[in-house]
């Protein structure tokens, strides 16, 4: 069987992780990386992102390793014209619209576009649906962390005077236990998570910066917030990793008997796990096209066996 020919669009943290992990796949060959930059620190062939159409006959799947704020919404439909695509679009509220736009582009080209892969959306999405379907009368809560929030960290770094900063999202242990007991029905996201900030800044700016953090709407207002000012050496030695994870907890009653389904992720490096998920769904996208399908699909619409490099008979014999 011929290997799946894949390429990467974008070369940030996620793109580098995808590149590294494709080398571990038994059924994929990396054709190249499409970038706006002329040169990259890699041995993989680099092509101008404007020339994707010139390589359409050489690529089966494009891994779109771009930002969700503007890049994916604006550019992903164009890429779906030339190959199957897999993205990690994570604006939850806008996923239905994104799926519709990608469906139009992919269907017109006869390709498959898998949208919003990763872990949330992605693996957490699948678990939410499975657990809720099994427990018809249920409470369900998603907790994020402990882990680095890239969006909130970026917000900290935009504050004048901040030299370096990271923000960790921490789930409330009390809220976790309430969720496991089925007693967290009235808790909001702001009550279930804590924002922990580590900031490098001149001492004269500390008071103003802390006030700016605590009063920042959409990011910190309403949350329990902890602000820690540290020196640059401590920051560089202790706060340059990218851990993350979380819990999906579903509790339900089946006529007097209580049940709990808890799905946990503990990730040493967020981009690597997100890339691993994206790659598995890339395999599925290629197989779905081979089966004659086209259009856009979420992770909920993909048969699990399509993700695995192993054949279905072996999976059934071992895992069912």
Swiss-Prot record:
Pfam families reported in the protein's UniProt record: DAPDH_C
Pathway entry: Amino-acid biosynthesis; L-lysine biosynthesis via DAP pathway; DL-2,6-diaminopimelate from (S)-tetrahydrodipicolinate: step 1/1
CDD domains (alphabetical): meso-DAPDH_N (cd02270)
Catalytic activity: meso-2,6-diaminopimelate + NADP(+) + H2O = (S)-2-amino-6-oxoheptanedioate + NH4(+) + NADPH + H(+)
EC number: 1.4.1.16
InterPro entries: Diaminopimelate_DH_Ddh, Meso-DAP_DH_C, NAD(P)-bd_dom_sf
Residues that hold NADP(+) according to the record: 11-14, 35-37, 65-68, 88-90, 117-121
Regulation: The enzyme is also inhibited by L-cysteine, and by p-chloromercuribenzoate, iodoacetic acid and HgCl(2) in vitro.
GO BP field: diaminopimelate biosynthetic process; lysine biosynthetic process via diaminopimelate
Record bears the keyword Iron-sulfur: no
Domain of life (superkingdom): Bacteria
pH curve summary: Optimum pH is about 9.8 for the oxidative deamination of meso-diaminopimelate and 7.9 for the reductive amination of L-2-amino-6-oxopimelate.
Keyword Oxidoreductase: yes
Annotated binding of substrate, by residue: 90, 120, 144, 150-151, 169, 195, 244, 270
Keyword terms of this UniProt record: Amino-acid biosynthesis, Diaminopimelate biosynthesis, Lysine biosynthesis, NADP, Oxidoreductase
GO molecular function terms noted in the UniProt entry: diaminopimelate dehydrogenase activity
Role of this protein: Probably plays a role in lysine biosynthesis.
Comment block on domains: Is composed of three domains: a dinucleotide binding domain, a dimerization domain, and a substrate-binding domain.
Family to which the UniProt record says this protein belongs: Belongs to the diaminopimelate dehydrogenase family.
Subunit structure, interactors included: Homodimer.
NCBIfam families: DAP-DH
Protein name according to UniProt: Meso-diaminopimelate D-dehydrogenase
Organism this protein belongs to: Corynebacterium glutamicum (strain ATCC 13032 / DSM 20300 / JCM 1318 / BCRC 11384 / CCUG 27702 / LMG 3730 / NBRC 12168 / NCIMB 10025 / NRRL B-2784 / 534)
Annotated gene: ddh
């Amino acid at each position: 069987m011929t290997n799946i020919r894949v390429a990467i669009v974008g070369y940030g943290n996620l793109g580098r992780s995808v590149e590294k992990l494709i080398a571990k796949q038994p059924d994929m060959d990396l054709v190249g990386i499409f970038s706006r930059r002329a040169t990259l620190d890699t041995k993989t062939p680099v092509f101008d992102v404007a020339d994707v159409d010139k390589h359409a006959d050489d690529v089966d799947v494009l891994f779109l390793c771009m930002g969700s704020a503007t890049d994916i919404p604006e550019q992903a439909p164009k890429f779906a014209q030339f190959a199957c695509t897999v993205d990690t679009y994570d604006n939850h509220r806008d996923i239905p619209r994104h799926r519709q736009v990608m469906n139009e582009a992919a269907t017109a080209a006869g390709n498959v576009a898998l949208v919003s892969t990763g872990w949330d959306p992605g693996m957490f999405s699948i678990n939410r649906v499975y657990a809720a379907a099994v427990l018809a009368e249920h409470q369900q809560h998603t907790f994020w962390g402990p882990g680095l929030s890239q969006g909130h960290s970026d917000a900290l770094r935009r504050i004048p005077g901040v030299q370096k900063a990271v923000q960790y999202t921490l789930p409330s242990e009390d809220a976790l236990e309430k969720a496991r007991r089925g007693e967290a029905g009235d808790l909001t996201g702001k009550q279930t998570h804590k924002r922990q900030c580590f900031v490098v800044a001149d001492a004269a700016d500390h008071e103003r910066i802390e006030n700016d953090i605590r009063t920042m709407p959409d990011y910190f207002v309403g949350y329990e917030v902890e602000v820690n000012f540290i020196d640059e050496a401590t920051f560089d030695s202790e706060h340059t990793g990218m851990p993350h994870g979380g819990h999906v907890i579903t509790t339900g009653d089946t006529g007097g008997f209580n049940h709990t389904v808890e799905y946990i992720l503990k990730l040493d490096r967020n981009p690597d796990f997100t890339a691993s998920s994206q790659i598995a769904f890339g395999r599925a996208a290629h197989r779905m096209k081979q089966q004659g399908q086209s259009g856009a699909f979420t992770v909920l619409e993909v048969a699990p066996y399509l993700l695995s490099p192993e054949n279905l008979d072996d999976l059934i014999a071992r895992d069912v």
